[in-house]
Regions:
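Acidic, Mg2+-coordinating catalytic module of metal-dependent nucleases/exonucleases
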Residues: 170-196
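Short beta-strand scaffold segments in enzyme catalytic cores
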Residues: 19-25, 181
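Residue-level detector of short, conserved catalytic/binding motifs and their immediate flanks
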Residues: 7, 19, 84, 177
């Protein structure tokens, strides 16, 4: 991933439930070398190229990892890579959840893992993801690398909430989807409906499977 691309890190906190961190980059449309191949992504494409997922290996079961360890591991994985924006669930800024005089956000920041409040609008966030999948000029505006195994695993199992048809069923393993939503809202796109490709997300949460994800989102290799 080129150093000069706009990069965003997103975080969703969990203790008994999984936590998730995703790293994304916004393409400027230039050619890049991936695995010895020169390819380009449409300008403004969001490439999710790294994940850190705190689960036990069982769906919706978190590692019960403390914030300092999450922060240290996150920064180690990032390895001095510079982020342009870092967004997280606004709940970590809740003053009522202070521990030893610090909010969860302040505790993370103590170990170099700094975040600002994500735009947490749920319906608008899911629409941003759908817009990126719809894309422009026949090409999607979101890509996920094969290293992001848990995002690829959990994305197709999402379902609409039966009582809130514009929202997701929050009882499902939606933690990395929330992070993807935060990142998408940090760099929103506008899609011209008249020129958009047929919407592959019309039955998005109901009918997607991993094969369709690879077809519609172009899973790519990244080392």
């Amino acid at each position: 991933i080129p150093h000069d691309w706009y990069k965003i890190r997103g975080f969703d906190w969990g203790y008994s439930a999984p936590f998730g961190v995703l790293w994304g980059a916004i393409s400027d449309g230039s050619l890049i070398n991936i695995g010895g191949k020169h390819i380009s992504f449409p300008r403004d494409s969001l490439i999710i190229y790294r994940e850190y997922y705190g689960w036990t290996g069982k769906p919706n079961k978190g590692l019960k990892m403390e914030l300092p360890e999450i922060a240290k591991n996150t920064m180690q994985m990032q390895d001095n890579e510079v982020m342009n924006k870092q967004v997280a669930d606004p709940a970590i800024f809740d003053e009522s959840k202070k521990n030893m005089g610090m909010t969860q956000a302040e505790e993370l920041a103590k170990y170099g893992c700094i975040y600002e409040r994500a735009d947490n609008k749920r319906v608008a966030g899911w629409q941003q993801i759908r817009s990126r999948l719809t894309g422009r000029d026949g090409k999607p505006l979101i890509y996920i690398t094969e290293s992001c195994k848990n995002l690829i695993r959990t994305l197709p199992i999402m379902q609409y909430d039966k009582t809130k048809p514009e929202d997701l069923d929050t009882s499902l393993e939606d933690h990395l989807l929330d992070v993807l939503r935060y990142i998408s809202m940090a760099r929103p796109v506008t899609i011209d409906i008249k020129n958009a490709i047929p919407d592959p997300t019309r039955d998005f949460w109901d009918n997607f499977n991993p094969h369709q994800i690879r077809k519609n989102k172009k899973v790519i290799n990244y080392e």
